[in-house]
Regions:
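Short catalytic micro-motifs in class I SAM-dependent methyltransferases
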Residues: 114-118
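A short glycine-rich, Lys/Arg-flanked "PGG" loop and its adjoining helix->strand segment in the class I
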Residues: 125-137
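A conserved beta-strand element that flanks and buttresses the S-adenosyl-L-methionine
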Residues: 111
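Class I (Rossmann-like) S-adenosyl-L-methionine-dependent methyltransferase catalytic domain
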Residues: 1-41, 45-101, 119-123, 142-210
Length: 210
């Protein structure tokens, strides 16, 4: 019987085979968006960023005032702490996006990459809402999630058929579901499909309502 959930310990211990290729592209997209939405000198929060594969490029090219990471996987968080033991800008927090506490601070930018699709529809809506709970009025949310294009379906189907698919609880989303989740939270500023990822993802930028 196939596992019902993704084994994140195994993922962080041994990343998916194509990860290094797709991460470079995603990082370049994120850096451009952060630069264009006030990321320089900003307070940034990454949800689901255990052992973040984007933090190095963002710290180097965007130079935020602070970069906080929230995730519930201890192994991934420990790996990240080892990478940045003395950088005062970086804070690592163990937490669950579905049960976050009242925020101690609000951020200029909150983002996640490939997080909200790992829940049922109600959980996805809650995960999306958490981004905005930690975002200041007028701040920017950047959220990516897989979407079931013909290319995504073909590649995932092949991976599943050959027992190489590891994201067992991944639920590719259509843009309409995401738009419904943010309808009362903010305004979509841009939405595009990142085709070079092969396992295609939407990248959506949302401005929180004032």
């Amino acid at each position: 019987m196939k596992p019902a959930r993704t084994d994140w310990d195994s993922y962080y211990a041994r990343p998916y085979r194509t990860a290094s290729l797709t991460r470079k592209y995603t990082a370049s997209v994120l850096v451009d968006l952060l630069r264009n939405h006030g990321g320089v000198g900003a307070a940034i929060l990454e949800f689901g960023g255990a052992n973040s594969c984007f933090i190095e490029q963002i710290l180097d090219e965007i130079a935020p005032a602070r970069y906080d990471i929230v995730d519930n996987n201890q192994l991934g968080l420990d790996l990240l702490k080892c990478r940045y033991p003395r950088d005062q800008r970086v804070s690592v927090i163990r937490g669950d996006v579905l049960s976050m506490h009242e925020p101690e601070r609000l951020y200029d930018i909150v983002f996640s990459v490939g997080l909200i699709e790992h829940f049922d529809p109600a959980g996805t809506a809650r995960a999306v809402a958490a981004h905005f709970s930690y975002l200041r009025p007028g701040g920017t949310a950047i959220i990516t999630f897989p979407t079931p294009t013909w290319l995504y379906r073909a590649v995932r189907g092949l991976a599943e058929a050959t027992n190489n698919w590891i994201f067992h609880d991944e639920r590719p989303l259509r843009l309409a579901e995401f738009e419904s989740a943010i309808a009362n939270l903010g305004r979509v500023e841009s939405a595009r499909i990142l085709w070079p990822l092969i396992l295609t993802q939407y990248c959506v930028v949302v401005r929180k309502f004032p």
